[in-house]
């Protein structure tokens, strides 16, 4: 074969493939229902969007690559008779921006973003906009933390706050200027910066509803102090206790709700201190995830005010008002019930981290995936082997130790502070870690503790034990990232957060090794060996390098910006040498050059495709649905969906 032909083949394999398309993986299962979901961040707008008399859901999603205003049509009918319809798959109305909020007025629904109103929203989304005459940046933060955003959520609504007949402007502001962003723990795990703040402002209208003239804003007070939630207040003024005045209900950046009873009058509101909402059983009313966005709306048409709540991972729930008031004068709600839709494309929460593997031993490729919530989900391939476009079952949450598995940061587990308590950021590999013939799960998370779930079931029915640490034969105390406040236990592995643990027999000695980022962001080789009949890892060696042999440092940043690299190792181009697929606009190919002078070397080629699906990051994996023994690309994106691309090699 001539040199030019050789060069042509190399270019065809290694360069971005303009004719290669990333497509969302479809369920191909018309009778399947799954959680209703947009991408990352759900901002719900319940309404009769199509004028047929029943309630539909419009959901704004400002992520990438699923940015849009999405209409989920209710094909079942009256929500008084069936408050949990199975919605049709979403239809996109327009692109979107952050902080889309509805206001329900006596003349119909109005939809606002900071500084603007969007007429004809049900048909055209945010396509049209009219200025409101108030600067979107009216608020001046008072904190002095240098890191991070100063203001995030900025929520605008219309309501007649004081009952004078003209609509006022209400704005919820999330202030980060005291909190900062990351790396503020002391050695006891105490956050040294301030909290998030969630303030509620009123621009009183001194004109009319038709010709507003807004006064300077003031903060709403409760018992003489500013209403202040833990971020994202999502303020709703409504009469929950049926006494004729407007009470205030707020959400927050985490998962709960606070109620401020109006103990004044309709014309002169005065608010009691906030009280946390509870369910009828007395437990705290809480959503499954965080970054919640509640909308007050009588969904079941029974005359009381329910909540329609968006979650961070794109789901939306109905929180039913029971019609009862608690002894503490707060409305009592039922636990959240998450809506369902007809299955269209596979979705694993947000920031999906898929891994292709025959989990149930039936010969085909299933998908195991992590997400922001910290769960691990099993997507069963229902088609059997050698089916290029399989049919899929709805995901099932993996159990470990007999309980649904979920990693969460808790009060002080995230380097980015207590605002991330409900996140887990699981990322994983499936492999036979202990050599007993059964697939186990090795995972990393928001904590940076690398652990594994041992399979004690059978090849067709996996049963997982509770998580235990990987064992490393350190010569002394285990190292840790410089910003990690807690001390790892002896013999365990603590490294950078949210980065993939790659399980692979790199040195071909028959034992699965570990390749992943070390505490300083270098891609390192943790060699497996036997010690007293027990398998351990050796300390990391920085012997994965670039074409010149320089160690690959995939992330040199610190604290919250550390880690975050998603990767897999596979012979992508069929030359018999392992390559690396690393998160990028889709995935960047690092072509393996083999082992040279004691190090495995890789040359960066570039993205696999021209499409950019990168939000936070894309988590690369490979699958072989059609059974041709050629790995195809599967990327988990910010929107929680799986993007498939056929390997172009012949």
Positions of PLM-derived features:
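Sec-dependent signal peptide recognition
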Residues: 1-10
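Beta-propeller-forming repeat regions
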Residues: 13-650
């Amino acid at each position: 074969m001539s040199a030019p032909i050789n060069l042509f083949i190399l270019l065809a394999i290694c360069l971005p493939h303009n004719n290669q398309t990333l497509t969302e993986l479809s369920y191909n299962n018309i009778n399947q229902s799954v959680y209703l979901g947009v991408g990352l961040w759900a901002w719900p707008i319940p309404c009769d969007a199509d004028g047929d008399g029943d309630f539909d859901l419009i959901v704004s999603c400002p992520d990438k690559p699923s940015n849009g205003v999405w209409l989920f049509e209710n094909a079942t009918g009256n929500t008084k008779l069936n408050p949990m319809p199975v919605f049709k798959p979403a239809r996109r109305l327009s692109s979107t921006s952050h902080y889309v909020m509805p206001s329900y007025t006596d003349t119909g629904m109005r939809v606002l973003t900071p500084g603007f109103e969007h007429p004809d929203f049900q048909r055209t989304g945010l396509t049209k906009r009219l200025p409101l005459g108030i600067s979107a940046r009216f608020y001046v933060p008072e904190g002095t933390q240098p890191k991070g955003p100063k203001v995030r959520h900025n929520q605008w609504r219309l309501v007649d706050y004081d009952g004078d007949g003209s609509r006022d402007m209400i704005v919820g502001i999330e202030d980060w200027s005291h909190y900062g962003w990351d790396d503020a723990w002391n050695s006891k795990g105490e956050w040294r910066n301030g909290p998030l703040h969630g303030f509620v402002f009123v621009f009183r209208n001194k004109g009319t509803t038709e010709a507003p003239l807004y006064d300077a804003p003031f903060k709403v007070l409760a018992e003489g102090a500013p209403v202040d939630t833990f971020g994202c207040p999502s303020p709703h003024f409504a009469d929950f206790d049926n006494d004729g005045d407007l009470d205030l209900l707020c959400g927050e950046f985490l998962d709960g709700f606070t109620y401020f009873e109006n103990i004044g009058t309709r014309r002169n509101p005065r608010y009691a201190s906030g009280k946390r909402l509870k369910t009828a059983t007395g437990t705290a009313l809480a959503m499954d995830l965080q970054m919640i966005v509640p909308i007050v709306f009588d969904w079941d048409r029974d005359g009381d005010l329910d909540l329609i709540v968006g979650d961070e991972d794109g789901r939306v729930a109905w929180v039913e008002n029971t019609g009862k008031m608690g002894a503490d004068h707060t409305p009592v709600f039922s636990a959240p019930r998450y809506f369902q839709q007809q299955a269209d494309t596979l979705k694993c929460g947000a920031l999906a981290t898929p891994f292709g593997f025959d989990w149930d031993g039936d010969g085909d490729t299933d998908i195991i995936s992590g997400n922001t919530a910290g769960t691990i989900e099993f997507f069963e391939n229902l088609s059997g082997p050698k089916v290029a476009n399989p049919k899929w079952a709805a995901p099932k949450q993996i159990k470990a130790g007999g309980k649904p598995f979920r990693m969460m940061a808790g009060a002080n587990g995230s380097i980015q502070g207590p605002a991330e308590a409900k996140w887990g950021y699981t990322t994983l590999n499936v492999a036979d870690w202990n050599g007993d013939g059964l697939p186990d799960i090795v995972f990393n998370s928001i904590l940076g503790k690398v652990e594994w779930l041992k399979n004690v079931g059978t090849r067709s029915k996996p049963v997982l034990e509770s998580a235990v640490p990987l064992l490393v034969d350190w010569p002394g105390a285990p190292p840790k990232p410089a910003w990690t406040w807690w001390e790892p236990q002896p013999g365990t592995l603590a490294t950078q957060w949210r980065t993939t643990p790659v399980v692979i027999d790199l040195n071909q000695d028959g034992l699965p090794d570990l390749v992943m980022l070390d505490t300083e962001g270098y891609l390192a080789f943790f060699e497996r060996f036997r010690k007293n009949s027990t398998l351990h890892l050796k300390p990391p060696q920085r012997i994965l390098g670039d074409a010149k042999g320089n160690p690959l440092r995939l992330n040199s940043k610190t604290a919250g910006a550390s880690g975050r690299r998603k990767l897999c190792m596979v012979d992508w181009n069929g030359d018999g040498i392992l390559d690396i697929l690393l998160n990028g606009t889709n995935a960047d190919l690092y072509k393996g050059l083999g082992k040279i002078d004691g190090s495995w070397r890789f040359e960066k080629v570039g993205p696999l495709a021209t499409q950019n699906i990168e939000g936070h990051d894309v988590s690369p994996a490979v699958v072989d649905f059609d059974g041709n023994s050629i790995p195809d690309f599967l990327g988990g994106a910010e929107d929680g969906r799986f993007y498939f691309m056929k390997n172009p090699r012949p």
